[in-house]
Curated annotation (Swiss-Prot):
Pathway annotation: Carotenoid biosynthesis; beta-carotene biosynthesis; Carotenoid biosynthesis; phytoene biosynthesis; all-trans-phytoene from geranylgeranyl diphosphate: step 1/1
Predominant localisation class: membrane
Catalytic activity: all-trans-lycopene = gamma-carotene; gamma-carotene = all-trans-beta-carotene; 2 (2E,6E,10E)-geranylgeranyl diphosphate = 15-cis-phytoene + 2 diphosphate
EC annotation from Swiss-Prot or TrEMBL: 5.5.1.19, 2.5.1.32
Coiled coil: none
GO molecular function, one term: intramolecular lyase activity
Annotated protein name in UniProt: Bifunctional lycopene cyclase/phytoene synthase
């Protein structure tokens, strides 16, 4: 029977009228899901479960809904036109618009698999750093749009030609308008994203589904009727089917990119306008797509530098921060970036005098920031000028209203103790467990408190009377991480050990168990005396046991897990966040 003059005798079998029940049920198509798609989805879910956020669930649910609604009419037309056919004994029997329920389930699970793959590979990305003005790269925008329009025109031509070009034309005419809309909406963000995570998120699910579909077609679960396809195969799979999986996964990934673009705009708005609402919802975020924001290039540059700094020098903290989201994650990145900048200035100082200069300058800049005073103009040249600008910039992006000036003061006291780790001094600065506890409190303990203060600001707390106890738990947790045993038999405190070792100046940081003898300068890195008997004694002592006990049972951990909507695996992240300043 002719249909619009384009198909001739395609109806190989009579297609029954629309109904929800068909004759004898079989589970061949369902078994294909049990073999290929459900195991893949389950494995990805288990892998990504500790990192699931409300934003992820929202994006995936919306994409699945859109995928089903967008595909149902198109797929129903293919089946009613007998381009796709299913043996009656290959499906369970339930149908929606003549589409077997197994096929409808496939739309959902394909979207779910591709979405999870995208979430896994893009989890470390800090979304606002890829924002650019919508006026940039307009040439790229129009070139890609022209290519998509050309493909859509080619699909229309295929439909007009009919016969063996029919299925190919239907795929292009269905997919290209959606791809064009997605590209025009999100091109400023998409063109700046790293290409590897995006391409991988498309290719891996596509390859998996190519294999699964070729096996399903090989067993006769379903087929494309002769006369509607090109009869060109790629590894046993029809060319049109390979193209379908490729473009459908592209639509899913571009849809997720569009959601991330909207989230990135709202995160940027919160970053550039601190008075704006800190709670991010997809509805609020999507509204920003209709009114592009002016992008401050200097702010994006500062965020990018902070991210690159952590990627290079504090990889564990950067990866761990991915469990947080939105403005909280950005504030944590700026906070830890400041710690890294200050730590590097102290470690790389040529002498103690220069190191003390940076501590004094840092204290002055922090005080000015907390008093909302403009930073005084100091003109330095050469390397010192670059270092001063790096310090000034790292402090200028800290959120002073969320953080206590006393905490920063304690952190600077920890840096001042670091200056006493000098092989030329007669006395080692840590002479007792009390000194060790105090040093750990000034360094990692303070970082734990700062992290808690940021979390409290962004997430809030119902019982204000619990806040002091939670802050103490945060500090104890930081101290426990500072003093935790390491694989080399040492401890994380005494971070100068690695620096001195690199200079060939490693000296005995620890007194002996009796406290009567100090190791001489020049001990090698391998020297057992480098950490001495007292270090081992302290690590086995009651003080460390108590600190670790506080860490394990800290209500602070429970608080963060509860308010960040994450699982108990957040402990891994927290360990990275309050880890010593390496």
């Amino acid at each position: 029977m002719n249909q619009n003059g384009t198909r001739l005798c395609y109806s190989v079998r009579e297609v029954p009228p629309t109904s929800f029940v068909s004759a004898p049920a079989n589970y061949k198509r369902a078994s294909s899901h049990c073999t290929y798609t459900i195991p893949a989805a389950s494995a990805l879910t288990v892998l990504y479960y500790p990192f699931f956020t409300a934003q992820d669930r929202c994006k995936i649910c919306i994409l699945i809904t859109i995928a089903i609604l967008a595909t149902l009419p198109w797929d129903s037309y293919l089946i009613r036109s007998a381009i796709w056919t299913y043996p009656p004994d290959a499906v369970v029997g339930l149908k929606i618009l003549d589409i077997p329920i197994e096929e409808v389930f496939f739309f959902a699970i394909q979207t779910y698999i591709t979405s999870l793959t995208y979430c896994i590979f893009t989890k470390p990305l800090v979304r606002p750093m890829y924002l650019r003005s919508h006026l940039e790269r307009r040439g790229t925008r129009y070139v890609v749009a022209t290519v998509i329009l050309a493909l859509m025109g080619g699909g229309t031509a295929c439909l007009l030609l009919g016969r063996r070009m029919t299925y190919l034309g239907l795929i292009l005419v269905w997919a290209c308008p959606i791809l064009l809309f997605q590209w025009m909406m999100s091109y400023p963000f998409l063109s700046e994203l790293p290409w590897k995570p995006t391409i991988t998120s498309i290719c891996l699910p596509t390859l998996h589904l190519w294999f699964a579909d070729s096996r399903a077609m090989g067993t006769g679960t379903w087929r494309i009727e002769e006369g509607t396809k090109l009869n060109f195969r790629i590894g046993g799979l029809e060319l049109e089917e390979a193209l379908f999986f490729l473009v459908s996964n592209m639509m899913v990934v571009l849809g997720l990119v569009g959601c991330d673009y909207a989230y990135a705009l709202q995160e940027y708005e919160s970053l550039s306008q601190p008075a704006s609402d800190v709670y991010i919802t997809l509805r609020k975020a999507l509204s920003l797509l209709a009114r592009p924001l002016p992008i401050d290039a200097s702010l994006i540059s500062a965020l990018s530098q902070a991210v690159y700094r952590l990627q290079e020098k504090s990889q564990s903290m950067f990866l761990g921060s991915a469990l947080f989201q939105g403005q909280l994650r950005i504030d944590l990145i700026f906070l830890y970036s400041f710690c890294r900048v200050m730590d590097d200035l102290i470690d790389e100082a040529e002498d103690e005098q220069e190191a003390r200069f940076w501590v004094t300058e840092c204290r002055h800049l922090l005080d000015s920031t907390h008093r909302s005073e403009p930073h005084s103009d100091h003109f330095y040249t050469g390397k010192k000028g670059e270092e001063h600008e790096r310090l000034r910039q790292s402090i200028s992006y800290l959120p002073p209203s969320h953080l206590s000036n006393d905490s920063f003061d304690d952190l600077l006291k920890g840096f001042e103790i670091d200056l006493k780790f000098n092989p030329q001094r007669e006395a080692f600065p840590i002479q007792s467990e009390y000194c060790l506890d105090q040093y750990a409190g000034f360094v990692a303990g303070t970082v734990g408190v700062l992290v808690f203060d940021l979390t409290l600001f962004h997430c809030g707390h119902y019982f204000i009377q619990d806040v002091p106890r939670l802050r103490r738990a945060a500090k104890d947790m930081g101290k426990a991480m500072q003093c935790q045993p390491r694989g080399d038999g040492g401890a994380t405190s005494g971070r100068k050990r690695a620096i001195a070792g690199n200079r060939g100046e490693l000296y005995g940081y620890w007194t002996t168990a009796e406290g009567a003898e100090r190791h001489k300068p020049g001990a090698s890195v391998e020297d057992e005396g480098a950490f001495g008997a007292t270090a081992k004694s302290w690590l086995a002592g009651d003080v460390i046991t108590e600190l670790c006990h506080c860490f394990i049972q800290a209500e602070y951990v429970i608080y963060l897990v509860r308010h960040q909507n994450a699982s108990a695996d957040t402990l891994v992240l927290l360990s990275a966040l309050v880890y010593r300043l390496e």
